[in-house]
Amino acid sequence: MSEFVTVARPYAKAAFDFAVEHQAVDRWQDMLAFTAQVTRNEQIAELLSGAVAPETMSKTFIAVCGDQLDEPAQNFIRVMAENGRLLVLPEVLLQFIQLRASLESTVDVEVSSASPLNDEQLAKIAAAMEKRLSRKVKLNCKIDKSVMAGVVIRAGDMVIDGSVRGRLERLADVLQS
């Protein structure tokens, strides 16, 4: 998997630089998301991992994508096909998203709670995380009944566990030691 990261990095950087230069970051992210989804199709994955000529591979892939790809994106796919790298498109997408977040000074923050949070609670969490991280945050909320009460906040490798479950686990650890 780390090989995919290494292989995908220059493609993601090239796509991102092109998208920024042409003010088409949203469009390129959508195109990359679509192509990444196409590579997850079993039949396409078999085609891409088989011994097919790069030209045939790129033509077939572009035909499957149809109108979703503009001319520069088709050229991007051709280059990746020539180098046998179409299977790394999902990783290219992930790195493209990271580059975009870095450019926009945003960070994705996952907020897990036992029940839905109201707008006021979300605003307070967003403000606190923006202050702590010195960046804009994009909250991704999910319901997790195992949290019991409170919230668990994840941003990158940072975890803030304000859940009742987390408190009970920490209390149990203290009592056992």
Curated annotation (Swiss-Prot):
Give the membrane topology.
Answer: Peripheral membrane protein
Claim: Endoplasmic reticulum is one of the keywords in the record: no
Residues crossing the lipid bilayer are none
User: Which key words are in the record?
Assistant: ATP synthesis, Cell inner membrane, Cell membrane, CF(1), Hydrogen ion transport, Ion transport, Membrane, Transport
Drop me one GO molecular function for this one: proton-transporting ATP synthase activity, rotational mechanism
Keyword Transmembrane helix in record: no
* Alphabetical list of SUPFAM superfamilies matching this protein: N-terminal domain of the delta subunit of the F1F0-ATP synthase
Q: Which PANTHER family match?
A: ATP SYNTHASE DELTA CHAIN
Indicate the family of this protein. Answer: Belongs to the ATPase delta chain family.
Free-text function comment from the UniProt entry: F(1)F(0) ATP synthase produces ATP from ADP in the presence of a proton or sodium gradient. F-type ATPases consist of two structural domains, F(1) containing the extramembraneous catalytic core and F(0) containing the membrane proton channel, linked together by a central stalk and a peripheral stalk. During catalysis, ATP synthesis in the catalytic domain of F(1) is coupled via a rotary mechanism of the central stalk subunits to proton translocation.
Task: Give the protein's recorded name.
Answer: ATP synthase subunit delta
Q: Which organism is it from?
A: Yersinia enterocolitica serotype O:8 / biotype 1B (strain NCTC 13174 / 8081)
